[in-house]
Amino acid sequence: MDIVEYKSDVWGREVLLGASWDLLWVVIALSFVFIAVHAVIMAVRKREAKPSSDGPKVHRHAAIDRLFHWVMAIAIFVLLITGVLPIIGVEFSWLTIHWIAGLVLTAVVVFHIVRSLFWQDFMSIWVTPKDIKEPFDDSIKPGKYSFAQKSMHAAVTVLTLLVIVSGLVMFALIDTPWWDRTNALSEATLGWIFLAHGLSTLALIGVISLH
């Protein structure tokens, strides 16, 4: 099994083609293993008493945050469907749908970053040294977000930004309603972009499975 794939450019030189999609099956297999192990752990775990519904209700997420979450989720799933299915042999006209979903994802992520910086407590979701002790010390109580939630957010943030940046570079090179296809990047450079896009996509599939 290969991690990366190579090809010969127009001069016969070996250049990167991108990530090997053999890794997709590894990610899928590991995801199923994790889900199965998690299900077993939850089945045998001692269930704690459910908290009372008495008292004031805590408003954890504003409507705009829930809307952002679902628009982002739908965009990512459309990107995965249109990006992965053609790789495994399901042929359909996918490219236009793919880049439209990519632009939607980019727009909602930029909106979320701006809103987080100026209208929310930006640092409340980021992992701090204190948070790392939380899983090992029952006396440490999480705030609004637990260590697991903060870690998941950090992973999704890094991977999503990698997918977006590499995707925008590729988008700038294809035919669109606004510009024609260009060969501005060498095949070697483009191979590194494909590699970054492919590996971050595969990692995002794994993280979504954990989520």
What is the predicted role of each segment?
Residues 1-210:
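Membrane-embedded alpha-helical bundles that constitute the cytochrome b-like, heme-associated redox core
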